[in-house]
Amino acid sequence: MRLLLAAAIAVALLGTAQATAGLSDAEVIVAYCRKAAPALAGKGVPVEDRTPVGMCVGYISGLADAFQHLCATSHLKGRLPLEQRKGIASVTANPENQSYASIISSFIKFADENPDLLDITPTPLLLQRALQQEFPCNIPKE
């Protein structure tokens, strides 16, 4: 019985490691987010795509929420460099136009327009650039 339990735990951990192995890899997140397109359009998601869709929505919404927090605290002088504050503030520039669906769509669009950045840019920075392009926000210089 103990051997069976140990084997089940090992298999579960292996699956978790494989599912999260590439979260910092922009190409992986973009691929997951492409599978989310039907869900974002209000259509169903095939059973086999539910995990990647959940990973996309969870990852992107977590980053967007973190960016909003950073934007709210970035008014403190010297807290963040100006260019970084502009990208982060983009998340809250036009809240009426933003939803996780629009943020994910902007992320996919930016990735499609800049495929050369996918293998050299960390995912959070890629999302920041996508948001800055789609939802520009001007922050006065210090």
Predicted features along the sequence, with ranges:
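Short N-proximal segments of mature Sec-exported proteins
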Residues: A26-S105
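N-terminal signal peptide c-region/cleavage motif recognized by signal peptidases
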Residues: L14-A19
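Short, structural beta-strand-to-alpha-helix junction motif
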Residues: A21-I29, S99, T121-P122, L126
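C-terminal partner/receptor-binding element of secreted or periplasmic proteins
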Residues: L117-E142
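Helix-rich interaction surfaces within compact, conserved domain-sized segments
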Residues: Y100-A111, P115, L127
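Amphipathic alpha-helical segments in well-ordered regions
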Residues: G62-A66, F110, A130, E134
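Sec-dependent signal peptide recognition
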Residues: M1-A8
